[in-house]
């Protein structure tokens, strides 16, 4: 395995004290709300990493900290209700690691409870914070900036299939900042002199989406990061194999499950980083003085078995830059 590349850019200064007790006004252990729109089966790795980040700052669940877990069970419509429950319980901090949806829902309900997010979206563009250097009052976290990731994903696909002229982008209607994602993907394709076709799928339209991809004779496909698509991972990978579509995905869970390639943030780091910031806030630092930080690590994974199954030869240059190659 080639060492993963670390690229963190903290965009601000030191934080000052902000005693939790002054806000919580309640006895006992500090309480952290953990909010994700998926289910434990899909986000359990992020939850474990979140606990690890907290432990690195001295907080251990059950010993000197209580964590209230709220899972949307892959129903994004439940997220505002779950956020409202955490706000009603007056938890000390709300964490939404690895998702923007939970952070946005919590922000709409409270301006006093600190909120920590980690997301692949630009937090300024989607309205989570007003500035990376000086985040909004009670909201801060980590971001990996999907615009850069999408451009890189397309570049990797192009290097794998250099003859490709027409690329596809598989999205859902409910992705946060959908219009921006589509525009960025099309701009990245145009910069390479390629075409980008967008295929939008609903929960019951995954099969139809791949039929559409095949009918459009697309040479390769980018699968966007999205809760619905993550929940349908097995189905999507089966269809990609059936149609022999070269595809790149947003995190290594896809490659581990049989996806051809993945490029994106390390999921566990999204949880760990959120845990680190929550721990710092519990120790007294102010959210708005903790700068939004760039995600520290990304990884590029190639599944050679899948590549061979669809009859593609991986250029040595791609193998050389891969962080991991699954044989």
Question: Where are the regions a protein language model picked out?
Answer:
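Short hydrophobic alpha-helices and adjacent helix-cap/hinge residues
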Residues: 1-327
């Amino acid at each position: 395995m080639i060492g993963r590349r670390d690229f963190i850019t903290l965009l601000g200064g030191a934080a000052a004290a902000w005693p939790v007790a002054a806000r919580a006004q309640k006895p006992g252990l500090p309480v952290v709300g953990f909010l994700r729109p998926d289910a434990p089966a899909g986000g359990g790795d992020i939850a474990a990493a979140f606990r690890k980040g907290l432990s690195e700052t001295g907080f251990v669940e059950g010993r000197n900290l209580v964590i209230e877990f709220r899972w949307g069970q892959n129903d994004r419509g439940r997220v505002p209700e779950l956020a409202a429950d955490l706000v009603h319980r007056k938890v000390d901090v709300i964490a939404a690691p690895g998702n923007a949806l939970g952070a946005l829902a919590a922000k709409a309900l409270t301006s006093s409870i600190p909120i920590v997010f980690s997301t692949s979206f630009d937090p300024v563009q989607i309205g989570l914070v007003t500035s990376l250097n000086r985040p909004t009052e009670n909201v801060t976290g980590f971001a990996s900036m999907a615009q850069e990731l999408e451009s890189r994903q397309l570049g990797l696909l192009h290097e794998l299939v250099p003859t490709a002229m027409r690329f596809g982008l598989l999205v859902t209607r409910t992705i946060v900042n959908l219009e921006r994602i589509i525009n960025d993907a099309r701009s990245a394709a145009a910069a390479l002199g390629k075409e980008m076709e967008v295929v939008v799928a609903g929960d019951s339209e995954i099969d139809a989406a791949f039929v559409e991809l095949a009918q459009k004779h697309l040479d390769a496909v980018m699968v966007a990061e999205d809760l619905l698509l993550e929940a349908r991972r097995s189905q999507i990978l089966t269809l990609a194999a059936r149609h022999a579509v070269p595809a790149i995905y947003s995190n290594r869970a896809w490659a581990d499950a049989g996806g051809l390639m993945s490029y994106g943030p390390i999921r566990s780091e999204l949880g760990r980083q959120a845990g680190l910031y929550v721990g710092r806030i519990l120790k007294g630092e102010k959210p708005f003085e903790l700068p939004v930080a760039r995600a520290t690590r990304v990884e590029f994974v190639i599944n050679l078995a899948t590549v061979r199954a669809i009859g593609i030869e991986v250029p040595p240059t791609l193998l050389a830059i891969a962080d991991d190659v699954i044989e």
